[in-house]
Design a protein with these regions (language model features):
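An aromatic-rich alpha-helical recognition segment common to small helix-rich domains
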Residues: 1-2, 13, 38, 46-50, ...
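Conserved aromatic anchor
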Residues: 1-7, 91-102, 228
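Recognizes extended acidic, P/S/T-rich segments that occur
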Residues: 10-44, 107-136, 268-270
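Beta-strand-rich modules
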Residues: 38-62, 129-161
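Hydrophobic core positions of the immunoglobulin-like beta-sandwich fold
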Residues: 38-39, 97, 130-131, 215, ...
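Low-complexity, Pro/Ser/Thr- and charge-rich linker/hinge segments at domain boundaries
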Residues: 70-89, 161-183, 334-344
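Aromatic, loop-rich ligand-recognition surfaces of beta-strand-rich domains
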Residues: 194-261, 291-344
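Extracellular carbohydrate recognition and processing domains
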Residues: 262-298
Length: 344
């Protein structure tokens, strides 16, 4: 309220067709302005009539105002900020939102590396932040709105996600039990970051299923997930020599020179799943998109490993030859254990 007459002493606010009211005193400190909050009020539109009175009890002319009370119904339809990216940046995570110009900001809640839950407000003018979150841990964020003339901020429903694990580099670890290559599709293509090149075994070399390849990670890693990209160009997805069933193995010991499984631990058995469930040779757009995006798997036997081995047990087309384009491994890097003997 703003007022100029020093003789005003009190006032009354009416609403709900004068069924409800609130009396208030007008400050005598000469400030000429003050505010009054009516609470609680149910969500909705309101019309208000205000009377002021001087020290002799004479009323003013009625002043009429309108206003809106926001609440759960309004908050339930609030838009949430679009998350553009969550990326690993060295030992921290970079987060960026988009389409936030009409919003006040975002409240991000996450677990930091000390094990504490932190809440960070990110203003829409910034729309990005860097945090020391735990890889693989859950985060949530709400979007803060402040409608025009509102005295309070309103909060959207929370969006929940997980911070990604770190992608670990690796190379081929040469052993006599690694399946030979044909057609010039070398196993090094599995870790070159190029989805147009891959590894291809063949029946001509005498190789029969299962086929296997051994890898050394750049550093010991607590593995949590991996992704395999099958041959999905043109109409190759979910047919021919694309892997259908396979196992993943790990060890921290230097692999035996004969390439045997001694000292290795099976981390899990995995199977490629075609989204449509249609017979081999029949593809939907969703099948193709799924194959090209790569198939991700959680590793049930989580542990810290330096060496990995994949064994392909069955192909989609029932063929003995196997082909796929790329492998990616994700987890939490650990310090070196002293093993540094590469067989490249």
């Amino acid at each position: 309220f703003f007022y100029t007459s020093p003789r005003l002493s009190r006032g009354v606010i009416y609403w709900n067709q004068k069924q409800d009211s609130l009396e208030f005193d007008i400050p005598a400190d000469g400030s000429r302005q003050f505010s009054k909050i009516i609470s609680p009020l149910a969500e909705g539109e309101y019309g208000y009539i205000v009377y002021t009175y001087d020290q002799y009890g004479n009323p003013s002319r009625p002043l009429e105002y309108s206003g809106r009370v926001y609440g759960p119904s309004y908050e339930s339809v609030l838009l949430t900020a679009d998350l553009e990216k969550v990326e690993n940046h060295d030992t921290q995570f970079y987060i960026k939102w988009k389409n936030v110009s009409e919003m006040e900001g975002m409240n991000l809640r996450y677990e930091n590396k000390s094990g504490r839950m932190d809440t960070l407000f990110v203003p829409s003018s910034q729309a990005e932040c860097t945090v020391d979150a735990v890889p693989g841990s859950e985060y949530s964020y709400t979007t803060i709105h402040r409608p025009e003339h509102s005295i309070d901020s309103l909060v959207s429903e929370a969006v929940i996600g997980k911070f990604p694990y770190y992608k670990t580099g690796f190379h081929i670890y040469n052993l006599p039990t690694n399946t030979p290559t044909e057609w010039g599709w070398n196993p090094e293509n599995l870790c070159d970051g190029n989805l147009e090149t891959g590894w291809h075994t063949g029946e001509g070399s005498g190789g029969k299923l299962p086929h296997q390849m051994t890898f050394e990670l750049d550093r010991p890693t607590e593995l949590h997930t991996f992704k395999i990209y099958q041959r999905a160009q043109d109409d190759w997805a979910f047919r021919a020599g694309n892997p259908k069933k396979y196992t993943l193995w790990g060890t921290n010991s230097l692999p035996a020179e004969d390439g045997s499984d001694e000292g290795w631990t099976m981390l899990g058995e995995f199977q490629s799943v075609k989204p449509s469930g249609l017979p081999v040779g029949t593809l939907t757009d969703a099948d193709i998109a799924y194959a090209r995006a790569g198939e991700s798997y959680d590793i049930p036997e989580v542990g810290v490993f330096r060496y990995l081995r994949i064994k392909v047990l069955e192909s989609w087309g029932g063929e003995q030859a196997v082909h796929f384009m790329e492998l990616e491994f994700f987890g939490i890097p650990h310090e070196e254990t002293g093993i540094n003997d590469s067989n490249i």
